[in-house]
């Protein structure tokens, strides 16, 4: 997104948080998220509507009135308010309003998880799912198949997830899989990152030679928190080629404590 769209999105995100913060209702937040996803489906298939909702030749009030006419009574009150705020904003391109509504729908669902006290669980589930797809090449290939319809891919993933994750994780994952222009692995990992940031946490990407258990992850998060002076989320995966130890990436900083890294440094010194 260009600057104007980023500014528009930030403004509407703030409004969304304001709308949801009143009663902090899980049901209100999740319904708003689902409704925004449905509106995106409409916009994806209607370029003229995207143009009308972002037309600078009309006033913001006229665009808000159009939203009321089209979606009033068809979506939840919060979703309608968000749509009106989005229509009133200035977007760089008509396509960006649809992209923005996806982000807003996801944020609403994550806020719902937060209100329910499950945002940390959703973060872990989303990241774990991204790693499962990374390992399960056949499943990922099926979900990334551009010849398959979105409905077919969503149905496949729904059968895999049913009863195994929270409702919010399932809704976010199914929506992500339904976006054919996105890599599902990266999209799910990005959603996990967003969940961490909403909790005020910094992400530490940990690659270890063996699986970390919960106590090891907690101890590592506490240790890194003391080093960086802020709460940390551990997103870990296994790479047996490290031979032992682990590597840790926080932002642009990398700490390489792996056996493979030590061997490589020793070889470099001896060369």
UniProtKB/Swiss-Prot annotation:
Keywords: ATP synthesis, Cell membrane, CF(1), Hydrogen ion transport, Ion transport, Membrane, Transport. InterPro entries: ATPase_OSCP/d_CS (IPR020781), ATPase_OSCP/dsu (IPR000711). It holds the Pfam family OSCP. The keyword Membrane applies. It is a peripheral membrane protein. PROSITE patterns: ATPASE_DELTA (PS00389). Coiled coil: none annotated. GO terms for cellular component: plasma membrane; proton-transporting ATP synthase complex. It is found in: Cell membrane. Its main location: membrane. PANTHER family: ATP SYNTHASE DELTA CHAIN. Belongs to the ATPase delta chain family. F-type ATPases have 2 components, F(1) - the catalytic core - and F(0) - the membrane proton channel. F(1) has five subunits: alpha(3), beta(3), gamma(1), delta(1), epsilon(1). F(0) has three main subunits: a(1), b(2) and c(10-14). The alpha and beta chains form an alternating ring which encloses part of the gamma chain. F(1) is attached to F(0) by a central stalk formed by the gamma and epsilon chains, while a peripheral stalk is formed by the delta and b chains. F(1)F(0) ATP synthase produces ATP from ADP in the presence of a proton or sodium gradient. F-type ATPases consist of two structural domains, F(1) containing the extramembraneous catalytic core and F(0) containing the membrane proton channel, linked together by a central stalk and a peripheral stalk. During catalysis, ATP synthesis in the catalytic domain of F(1) is coupled via a rotary mechanism of the central stalk subunits to proton translocation. This protein is part of the stalk that links CF(0) to CF(1). It either transmits conformational changes from CF(0) to CF(1) or is implicated in proton conduction. This is ATP synthase subunit delta. The lineage of its organism: Bacteria, Bacillati, Actinomycetota, Actinomycetes, Mycobacteriales.
């Amino acid at each position: 997104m260009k600057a104007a769209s980023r500014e528009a999105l930030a403004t509407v995100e703030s409004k969304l948080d304001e709308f949801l913060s009143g009663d902090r209702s899980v049901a209100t937040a999740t319904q708003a998220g689902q409704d925004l996803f449905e509106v995106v489906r409409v916009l994806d298939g209607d370029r003229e509507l995207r143009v009308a909702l972002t037309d600078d030749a009309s006033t913001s009030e006229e665009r808000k009135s159009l939203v009321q006419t089209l979606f009033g009574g068809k979506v939840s009150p919060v979703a309608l308010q968000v749509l009106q705020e989005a229509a009133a904003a200035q977007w760089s391109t008509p396509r960006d309003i649809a992209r923005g509504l996806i982000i807003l729908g996801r944020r609403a669902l994550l806020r719902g998880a937060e209100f329910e006290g499950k945002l940390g669980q959703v973060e872990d589930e989303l990241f774990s799912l991204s790693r499962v797809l990374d390992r399960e090449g056949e499943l990922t290939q099926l979900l990334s198949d551009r010849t398959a319809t979105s409905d077919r891919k969503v149905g496949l993933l729904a059968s895999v997830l049913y009863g195994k994750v929270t409702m919010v994780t399932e809704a976010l994952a199914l929506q992500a899989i339904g976006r054919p222009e996105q890599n599902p692995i990266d999209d799910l990992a990005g959603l996990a990152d967003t969940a961490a940031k909403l909790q005020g946490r910094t992400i530490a990407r940990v690659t270890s030679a063996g699986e970390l258990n919960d106590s090891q992850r907690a101890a590592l998060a506490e240790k890194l928190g003391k080093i960086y002076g802020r709460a940390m989320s551990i997103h870990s995966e296994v790479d047996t080629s490290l031979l032992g130890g682990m590597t840790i990436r926080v932002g642009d900083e990398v700490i390489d404590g792996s056996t493979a890294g030590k061997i490589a440094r020793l070889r470099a010194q001896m060369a």
